[in-house]
């Protein structure tokens, strides 16, 4: 399964992705995003920790307005 970086405050998303078998990394700094296939951020800060500046090779999913299921579906489609 994929290695997914998830912003610290999105604990429900972290748990759901772990249940699906993904390796979940908590994003506390820009370095945490390195090596991730995809990152999920709250969207409260559109450039959270510089992740939007191509710090990762994968997709960045903004969780704002999405349910946990929506986010999990986006992760599946992008990894």
From Swiss-Prot:
InterPro entries: UPF0180 (IPR005370). Pfam families: UPF0180 (PF03698). It comes from the Bacteria. Disulfide bonds: none annotated. Belongs to the UPF0180 family. This is UPF0180 protein BCAH820_1484. It comes from Bacillus cereus (strain AH820).
């Amino acid at each position: 399964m994929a290695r997914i970086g998830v912003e610290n405050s999105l604990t429900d998303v972290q748990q759901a992705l772990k249940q699906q078998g993904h390796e979940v990394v908590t994003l506390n700094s820009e370095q945490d995003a390195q090596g991730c296939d995809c990152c999920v951020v709250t969207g409260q800060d559109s450039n959270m920790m510089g992740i939007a500046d191509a710090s990762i090779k994968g997709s960045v999913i903004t969780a704002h307005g999405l349910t946990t299921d929506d986010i999990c579906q986006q992760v599946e489609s992008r990894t």
